[in-house]
C-alpha cells in the first residue's frame, strides 16, 4: 500500500513532469491557451502514458535490451495513433484545435522516460498506475495554466467545452468578466512562459512551507548517553 501511495504522490506532486522535471514543455506552452484544450491534451497524454506503461511492462521479459528504445517508440506510436483516431471520431472539434500536438505525443520525453525508468522494471499494474499518476500530474499543471491564460486573456472559463465533452457541455462556459479587447500577452507564448514561471514559484513556496512544518513537528532526537544527565 505504501508503494502505491508513493507512486501516486510522486506522479501528482513530488515528481510532477511539468513542474519538477520540466518535460513536455512544447505542448504545455503551445496548447494551454484555454482550459478545454489543456484538459483535452492532458487526458490524451494520460491515456497514452497508462496504456504504454502497461504494454511495455507486459512485454519487458521478451524485449531485447539492445533494441528496447525502438520497440518503446513503436509501442508509443501505435497507442498515440489509436488515441488520435478516437479523438478524431468522438471529439472532432478538439481534434482540430489540438492539431499536430496529438501525434507529437510520440516524441514526448515523459512517455519514453517512464517506459524506460519504471515500466521496464516493474509489474503491469504498478506501471499503469505510474503512467496514470504522471499523466494526471501533467494534466493538472496544463489545466491550471490553461485556466489562468483563458481567464486573463478572454475573461472566460471552459470556452469550447462542447468540443471535448459534447453539446451538453456548452452550459459549462463561464464568463468571469466581459472584455472587448483580449489580453494578448496571456494568450501568446510569452504569457505561457510567465504563467509557468509563477506556477513553479508557487510550488516551490508550498514545498518549502511543508518542509518547514515537518521539521517543526518532528520529535527532536536525544543524543545517545545524554539521558539522565543534569
UniProtKB/Swiss-Prot annotation:
Q: Name one GO cellular component term.
A: plasma membrane
Membrane topology per record? Multi-pass membrane protein
Q: Give the EC number(s) listed in the UniProt record.
A: 7.-.-.-
Q: Where in the cell is it found?
A: Cell inner membrane
Pfam families on file? Rnf-Nqr
Extract one GO BP annotation from the record.
electron transport chain
Q: How does it assemble?
A: The complex is composed of six subunits: RsxA, RsxB, RsxC, RsxD, RsxE and RsxG.
Q: Which family does it belong to?
A: Belongs to the NqrDE/RnfAE family.
Q: Which PANTHER family match?
A: ELECTRON TRANSPORT COMPLEX PROTEIN RNFE (PTHR30586), ION-TRANSLOCATING OXIDOREDUCTASE COMPLEX SUBUNIT E (PTHR30586:SF0)
Say what the protein does: Part of a membrane-bound complex that couples electron transfer with translocation of ions across the membrane. Required to maintain the reduced state of SoxR.
Name this polypeptide is given: Ion-translocating oxidoreductase complex subunit E
Q: Which organism is it from?
A: Salmonella newport (strain SL254)
Amino acid at each position: 500500500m505504501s508503494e502505491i501511495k508513493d507512486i501516486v504522490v510522486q506522479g501528482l506532486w513530488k515528481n510532477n513532469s511539468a513542474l519538477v522535471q520540466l518535460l513536455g514543455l512544447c505542448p504545455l506552452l503551445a496548447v494551454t491557451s484555454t482550459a478545454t484544450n489543456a484538459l483535452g491534451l492532458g487526458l490524451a497524454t494520460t491515456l497514452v502514458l497508462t496504456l504504454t506503461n502497461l504494454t511495455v511492462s507486459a512485454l519487458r521479459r521478451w524485449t531485447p535490451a539492445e533494441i528496447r528504445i525502438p520497440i518503446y517508440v513503436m509501442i508509443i506510436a501505435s497507442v498515440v495513433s489509436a488515441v488520435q483516431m478516437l479523438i478524431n471520431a468522438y471529439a472532432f472539434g478538439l481534434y482540430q484545435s489540438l492539431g499536430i500536438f496529438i501525434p507529437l505525443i510520440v516524441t514526448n520525453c515523459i512517455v519514453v522516460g517512464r517506459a524506460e525508468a519504471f515500466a521496464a522494471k516493474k509489474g503491469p499494474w504498478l506501471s499503469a498506475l505510474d503512467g496514470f499518476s504522471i499523466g494526471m500530474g501533467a494534466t493538472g499543471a496544463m489545466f491550471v495554466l490553461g485556466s489562468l491564460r483563458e481567464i486573463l486573456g478572454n475573461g472566460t472559463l471552459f470556452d469550447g467545452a462542447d468540443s471535448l465533452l459534447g453539446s451538453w457541455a456548452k452550459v459549462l462556459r463561464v464568463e468571469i468578466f466581459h472584455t472587448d479587447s483580449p489580453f494578448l500577452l496571456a494568450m501568446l507564448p510569452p504569457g505561457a512562459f510567465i504563467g509557468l514561471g509563477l506556477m513553479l514559484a508557487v510550488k516551490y513556496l508550498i514545498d518549502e512551507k511543508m518542509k518547514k512544518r515537518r521539521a517543526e513537528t518532528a520529535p527532536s532526537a536525544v543524543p545517545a548517553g545524554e539521558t539522565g544527565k543534569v
